[in-house]
Amino acid sequence: PYFSVWSSADRLTDDATRHWTGEPNPLTGLVRIDGKTYRIMGPEPKDVPALEQVSVEVRPTRTIYRFQNEAAAVELTFLGLAVPYNLDMLSSPVTYVAWKVESRDGKPHEASVFLGATGHLAVHSPDQAVVWGREELGALKAIKIGSQAQPILERRGDGTRIDWGSLYLASGQPRTVFAAAPAKTLAETFAKDGGLPAQDDAAMPRKVEDGAPALALATALGTVQPGTPAATFAMIAYDDEYAIDYMDEWLVGYWKHRLDEQGKGKAQPFTALLLKHHLRKDVYDSYCDGFDKRLVEVLTDLGGKEYAEIGALAHRQ
């Protein structure tokens, strides 16, 4: 429940994504088409123009944004595995972020995408210091950021943001690079040439309010041919390590219990869960799509189209 990122704007580029308390939890989305960079998520960098958003669709397990200009169309999808009768999926701390780019003018176009997340997502307040690092398992590569202090389960009450565990960006897709640096540096580097800094910033620990240390990944989609959309996906996830203080006993989340259980009682790294989700993305996507259709059909039968829209909006809340 601590991993909370919402867009409160009609257009995804109008405002920073936020925690449910209203505090910024900034994610940045950029797309580069034929050497020109556009924003598709977040208001920064301000000197990078926003790609026109033409629609947003909220389904029970996913939100789909669509953008376009004269040359290309971009579809950005956030998929959370919120299927109530499958506890392995429902408890998953992983959200998929997927992109699809297609030509609109019958010409080929070079395209690449960028996803960034600041240290705000891993602290209660920006005066806390964070550290970062990398992990990998097989084809899966990941970069993470978390508070230096790691005050596990110490905070209580409303308006509380998680400041223990680690936020991850992960991908097993080809032509994907990662970096950790100030948010402005990451976005400006991608906007300039479609890449990321060659080395992670080594100035850590650092307070989040000191230049907004952040993570980013960038994927080169190559040449998008007319009639053949290019697609890729990444994962944003949170490893909270411990989820509940139950009568002075720290308990892990259900997903972690199941992960260790599948490892025959041996503690498994978080990258094992990320690798599983990378490999099973198509399976989960199809499962969630079927659930979405069934739930919307039931809600429509019960109360009509608007009732179904409200139900889809409320489902992940």
For each predicted feature, which ranges?
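Short beta-strand-initiation
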Residues: P60-R62, V94, A212-A216
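An extended acidic
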Residues: F3-E70, G157-E188, K192
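Short Pro/Gly-enriched beta-strand edge/turn motifs at strand-loop
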Residues: E44-P49, L76-A82, Q199-A203
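Acidic/polar, glycine-enriched structural segments that form the non-catalytic walls/loops
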Residues: A82-M89, K100-Q317
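Low-complexity, acidic Ser/Thr/Pro/Gly-rich terminal tails and inter-domain linkers that flank the onset
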Residues: Q68-M89
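Short, solvent-exposed loop/turn segments enriched in Ser/Thr/Gly
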Residues: S91-V97
